[in-house]
């Protein structure tokens, strides 16, 4: 009778999965209506068995990203679609770090809803579908090759870091301007930026914590229980008052720019005191030259830096300071993206495609 017990167990598991999928489908529909006015693009719903087959049961050999600092961020796996009638053969599969619950289900469904409407933009991952049946919900993206998580220790080229900054600024600007109700990304993390192995394009993912700003308003105020994120990237108005606006993203991006130029270790050496935002600015002024600020790994890769490129790095720092509010009015992300695009264009034309 052992075979009968196994058959009964499989039937129970299948029934539980179907119930979970049905319940979560309702939550997803509510989030699509709430966040996207019901206009999300159609996506494929994968079964749990299809996901297990695509990832070889989430094998370690298929994992793209590891845990960061022992904090359980989302796990990414490469996978193959074995359906010969489906166009997307290579897949990137994101296994959500938490089990789906009444408390966090809205975040997961928001990730799906917003991912679906930004999929056509080159600086976002293209969403193929999702799996609502699994205990840990899953998102499925199209992948040309195996993408990698952004690791500043591996990205040592100045031009590549400049390109990443321009592409993420463009992604944030798109969220702020492309929809009737602007989206604020809110919680920027290096772990949510993936690099396409085929062309090195930086892509922003994970919209779990996005906030939409009502039409005619410039901010929303969150309750204390909703305030969260990486402390480095949180401006005081958000951290203390729960105010979320486009400036929330500008601040986080300004910190991201500084980490791109300095590297994580040097950033924390210069910017350890968040009680005084001028700490970095003052320390930078005491530095004798740009060499004392820029990531040493990147400088080693560059070799001799031209005076023109040093000036461009200085301008990059100044732009980051504007984003975090140290130099007058905080710029819109559209302006930041345009400025970075100019930096990138000037760097390419003046230095060619080799030295940096």
Curated annotation (Swiss-Prot):
ATP binds at residues 68-76, 94. InterPro entries: Kinase-like_dom_sf (IPR011009), Prot_kinase_dom (IPR000719), WAK-like (IPR045274). GO terms for molecular function: ATP binding; protein kinase activity. Residues 62-356 form the Protein kinase domain. Keywords: ATP-binding, Nucleotide-binding. Pfam families: Pkinase. It comes from the Eukaryota. The keyword Flavoprotein does not apply. One of its GO terms (biological process) is cell surface receptor signaling pathway. The protein kinase domain is predicted to be catalytically inactive. Interacts with RPP13L4/ZAR1. Belongs to the protein kinase superfamily. Ser/Thr protein kinase family. ZRK subfamily. This is Non-functional pseudokinase ZRK15. It comes from Arabidopsis thaliana (Mouse-ear cress). The lineage of its organism: Eukaryota, Viridiplantae, Streptophyta, Embryophyta, Tracheophyta.
């Amino acid at each position: 009778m052992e075979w009968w017990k196994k058959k009964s167990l499989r039937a129970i598991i299948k029934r539980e999965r179907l119930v979970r999928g049905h319940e979560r489908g309702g939550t997803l529909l509510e989030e699509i209506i709430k966040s996207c006015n019901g206009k999300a693009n159609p996506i494929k719903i994968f079964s749990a068995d299809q996901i297990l087959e695509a990832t070889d049961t989430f094998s370690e050999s298929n994992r793209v990203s590891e845990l960061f600092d022992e904090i359980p961020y989302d796990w990414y796996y490469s996978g193959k679609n074995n359906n010969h009638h489906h166009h997307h053969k290579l897949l990137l599969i994101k296994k959500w770090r938490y089990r789906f619950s009444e408390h966090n289900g809205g975040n997961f469904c928001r990730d799906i809803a917003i991912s679906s409407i930004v999929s056509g933009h080159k600086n976002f991952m293209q969403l193929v579908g999702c799996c609502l049946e699994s205990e840990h919900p899953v998102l499925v993206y199209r992948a040309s090759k195996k993408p990698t998580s952004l690791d500043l220790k591996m990205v040592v080229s100045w031009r590549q870091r400049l390109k990443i900054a321009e592409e993420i600024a463009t992604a944030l600007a798109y969220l702020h301007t492309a929809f009737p109700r602007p989206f604020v990304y809110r919680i920027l993390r290096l772990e949510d930026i993936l690099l396409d192995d085929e062309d090195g394009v930086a892509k922003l993912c994970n919209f779990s914590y996005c906030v939409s700003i009502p039409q005619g308003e410039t901010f929303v105020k969150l309750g204390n229980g909703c305030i969260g994120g990486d402390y480095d990237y949180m401006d005081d108005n958000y951290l203390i008052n729960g105010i979320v606006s486009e400036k929330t993203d500008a601040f986080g991006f300004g910190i991201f720019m500084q980490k791109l130029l300095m590297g994580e270790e040097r950033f924390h050496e210069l910017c350890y005191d968040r009680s005084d935002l001028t700490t970095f600015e003052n320390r930078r002024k005491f530095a004798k030259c740009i060499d004392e600020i820029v990531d040493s790994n990147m400088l080693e890769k560059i070799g001799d830096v031209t005076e023109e490129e040093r000036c461009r790095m200085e301008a990059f720092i100044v732009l980051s300071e504007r984003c975090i509010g140290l130099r007058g009015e905080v710029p819109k992300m559209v302006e930041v993206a345009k400025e970075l695009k100019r930096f990138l264009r000037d760097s390419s034309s003046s230095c060619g495609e080799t030295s940096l």
